[in-house]
Amino acid sequence: MKRLAVSILCLALAGCAIEKAEVRTPSFDEQLPAPQPSYASGSIWQAASAGIAEDHKARRKGDIITVVIVENASASKQATTDTDRKASISASIPYLMGLEKQKLILGKLTGADLGNLLGASTDSTFGGSGATTRKENLVATMSAKIIDVLPNGNFLIEGRRNVKVNNEDQIIILQGTVRPRDVSPDNTVNSSLIADARITYTGEGVISDRQRPGWLMNFLDYIWPF
């Protein structure tokens, strides 16, 4: 009887217990390193010498290409415009029912000349000239990384070089498309062989700030009507 009472009491306490919620921990996919290729060692060809015959030219995403930047550009333009326009008009009525020699002034008819009934003339002249000359020269060497390989095999490259001298940053940014056959055996390519090339050369620092007008001058130039 005593055992039965203890069993009933335990069941009652178990029914009043709060069920503990199961805590689920997020599962993460384990990232395993890519397996390295294995080479079978032979009597002549050893696994350690497998890189001797390998082509070291950049051809995969992430490979690095050395770009030799040589950009020379010059342009000049001159324009001269001269225009001259003249126009004249005149009209007369030699005969008008005999009234060509009469004119009504203050109730009296006097002689009238209809030979110069209407006359007008205009003269417009315009002259303008302009000339512009621009020269650019950029020589540099930098490395760029293959960021993508297109379906036709061409490389999309992108590179950035930052040189800081006396708190002045000189920044070169390069983007473009390169054909694999244009990459030389020493893994270099000339900038003239890069399609859709975007080469930006800029600076940040005290000297660059002094080469630009202040914000107030820019504002006055914007609102000044003359």
Swiss-Prot record:
<comment type="subunit">
    <text>The basal body constitutes a major portion of the flagellar organelle and consists of four rings (L,P,S, and M) mounted on a central rod.</text>
</comment>
<dbReference type="GO" id="GO:0071973">
    <property type="term" value="P:bacterial-type flagellum-dependent cell motility"/>
</dbReference>
<dbReference type="GO" id="GO:0009279">
    <property type="term" value="C:cell outer membrane"/>
</dbReference>
<comment type="similarity">
    <text>Belongs to the FlgH family.</text>
</comment>
<keyword id="KW-0975">Bacterial flagellum</keyword>
<dbReference type="InterPro" id="IPR000527">
    <property type="entry name" value="Flag_Lring"/>
</dbReference>
<feature type="lipid moiety-binding region" description="N-palmitoyl cysteine">
    <location>
        <position position="16"/>
    </location>
</feature>
<keyword id="KW-0732">Signal</keyword>
<protein>
    <recommendedName>
        <fullName>Flagellar L-ring protein</fullName>
    </recommendedName>
</protein>
<dbReference type="Pfam" id="PF02107">
    <property type="entry name" value="FlgH"/>
</dbReference>
<feature type="lipid moiety-binding region" description="S-diacylglycerol cysteine">
    <location>
        <position position="16"/>
    </location>
</feature>
<dbReference type="GO" id="GO:0003774">
    <property type="term" value="F:cytoskeletal motor activity"/>
</dbReference>
<comment type="function">
    <text>Assembles around the rod to form the L-ring and probably protects the motor/basal body from shearing forces during rotation.</text>
</comment>
<dbReference type="GO" id="GO:0009427">
    <property type="term" value="C:bacterial-type flagellum basal body, distal rod, L ring"/>
</dbReference>
<keyword id="KW-0472">Membrane</keyword>
<keyword id="KW-0449">Lipoprotein</keyword>
<feature type="signal peptide">
    <location>
        <begin position="1"/>
        <end position="15"/>
    </location>
</feature>
<keyword id="KW-0998">Cell outer membrane</keyword>
<keyword id="KW-0564">Palmitate</keyword>
